[in-house]
Structures are given as C-alpha cells and as structure tokens.
C-alpha cells in the first residue's frame, strides 16, 4: 500500500539516522524498560539520495520490556535510493501496535540496481497488531525482505481492514520482484475472520513468497489463494506464480492432565470448541 510507504518515510519526529550521500547511515540501538512512541513519531533510519550508488540505511535494534507504537507511530528503515534498507531487530516482552502503528523495512524506488528491502526479527511473549497496524518489509521494484516472529507466546491480529497485518511483498509498483518469506513460531495465533487482517507474502509480476508457520493453536485466520475481505494467510502473485504456504498446527487435547470431577445431580452444559486443522499447504 503506497500509504504505508509514505508513512515510513514521513516519520521525521523522533530518533533519526539518515544519509543523503554515498556513505551509509548509522545504526540505532535502544535499550530501555519501556518504549512508547505515539502520534506520528518514530525511530527511523533512511537512505534518501535518488542515486543508484547511494549509501544504505542503518540497522535498528531495540531491547525493551514493553514496546508500544500508537497513532501512526513507527519503527522504520527505509531506502528511497539504490541503497539497501537496514534490518530491524526487536527483543521485548510485549509488543503492541495500534491505530496505524508500523514496523517496516521497505525499499521505495525504481532505480537500477534496486536497493534491497531489509529483514525484520521480533522476539516477544506477546505481539498485538490492532486497527490497521502493520509489520512489513516491502519493495516497490525488487524482492520483499524476510520477517521472523520467533518464540511468540500469543500473536493477536485485530481490525486490519485490508491494510493491517504482516506483509512481505515484492514489486508492488508493478515491477518485477518476488515476495519475501515470513517465519512465525507461536503458541497461539488469534484473528477475527471478518476483520481482514492478513499474513501475506505477495508479488505483482514476480513469484509469491513463502510463509512458514508453526503454532499450537490458530483461530480466525486460514490459508486462501489470494486477498479477500476476510483474514487470510496467502502467498499469491497478481500476474506470476503463487508462492508456498506451510502451516503446522500442533494442537493439544485441552483436557489432557485434568482430573475427573465427581458426578453431581446437575452438570453444567459444556460446549466444546473447534480445534484447528493440522496442516494447510499451497
């Protein structure tokens, strides 16, 4: 979505490291108990010289107990040049993105050779994306980057409205470029089908990327061949070949380890929930 490309480059209030020449931008590392960024502010590295030989954007590394991005705030490493976007590494207990918050490592240009989109790695007990919030590593005219969400306790995806979710897309400005790869390991993944919050590794002319998910439970989101008004996991290409989706659900018996209760004259009614399917592939 071009809106998010613009947003990634517009985070000019906050902590910024940028290059306008042929040298690389510096890296940013933050170590703190709680980091809260709101109302359009951001932590940003960028390469903004419109030249194929421009320098690279810097990397961003954040270590925090709590990370909150609210109200079009974000963490962004972006290139508007032939330089590469930097990588983003987040290690936190709780990560919350709401009201358009973004974590993005994008390449936004049509120069040759193309600058590369960066990779995003997030390690957290809980990750929440709510109300059009987004984790993305996308290229306008090259390959999308890779996203790693590892050792996540709960991944909660809400109210995406077709914009929010987890995305690695290639060639989104109608250029050649393949989708990147998304790797997720989580205990629990929750979404609401009607809220259109997606996990997507797409492309326009190139090949769709790869999505590899291992979880104990997945609720409210499932594989589909392309983007729909519902919440989905997809690796489609508009004009090229689709990519690969591999979802492994290690569902456990929720009654395992429970002791039987003594019979009573009146038992409460028990409604058993549905357990997600074992595998979904495309």
Which functions belong to the PLM regions below?
Residues 1-282:
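Extracellular and secretory-pathway beta-repeat/beta-biased strand scaffolds
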